[in-house]
């Protein structure tokens, strides 16, 4: 099992104010590292290479669907690229016994919001979530555990939003 859970955000900014350095860091951490880890996992999992198959779970973001306008468009775009990787790789390696899926957390109470300069973001936006609250890392982890398990043996190229309906 591979869980790609690396992710960074930067300070809130509009696209017109984003530097090339910011974009390079965002895509290197959030997208390119996922590509490289997937590449290595396929080499170690593929039944076509004599291995036992496996499961790859990419931790994307609801931001990939929402866009994060006026805040983190670069983050959303990097996670959108991860979604496309999930689709293409799932199609490419299904016959080799590898399942590839993604989890898209929404407003989850973690330190990533503080690193982006908005430590109260989950509480501030909780009213925009149909369930009326932010989620927990444990709630995301439970979905990842299910996708990694044999209970999800016929699940590939799927996206599970853990976003309270947002």
Each language-model region and where it sits:
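Substrate-binding pocket helix/loop in short-chain dehydrogenase/reductase
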Residues: 13-15, 22-24, 125
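Active-site loop-to-helix junction immediately N-terminal to the catalytic Tyr of the SDR YXXXK motif
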Residues: 18, 67-76, 88
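Active-site helix of classical SDR
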Residues: 38, 78
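Alpha-helical segment proximal to the catalytic Tyr-Lys
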Residues: 43, 47, 91-95, 153
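Residue(s) in the substrate-gating loop at a strand-loop-helix junction
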Residues: 61
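A glycine/serine/threonine-rich, flexible loop-to-helix segment
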Residues: 71-72, 95, 107-129, 139
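C-terminal helical subdomain
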Residues: 95, 102, 123-151, 155, ...
């Amino acid at each position: 099992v591979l869980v790609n859970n690396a992710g960074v955000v930067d300070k809130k900014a509009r696209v017109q104010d984003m530097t090339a350095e910011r974009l390079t860091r965002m895509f290197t951490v959030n997208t390119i590292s996922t590509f490289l880890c997937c590449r290595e996992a396929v080499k170690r999992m593929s039944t076509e290479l004599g291995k036992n198959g496996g499961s790859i779970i990419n931790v994307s973001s609801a931001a990939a669907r929402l866009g994060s306008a006026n805040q983190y468009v670069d983050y959303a775009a990097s996670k959108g690229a991860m979604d496309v990787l999930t689709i293409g790789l799932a199609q490419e390696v299904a016959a080799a016994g590898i399942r590839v899926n993604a989890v898209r957390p929404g407003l989850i109470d973690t330190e990533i919001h503080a690193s982006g300069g908005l430590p109260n973001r989950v509480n501030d936006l909780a009213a925009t979530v149909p369930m009326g609250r932010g989620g927990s890392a444990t709630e995301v982890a439970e979905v990842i555990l299910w996708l990694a398990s044999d209970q999800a043996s016929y699940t590939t190229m799927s996206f599970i939003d853990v976003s309270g309906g947002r």
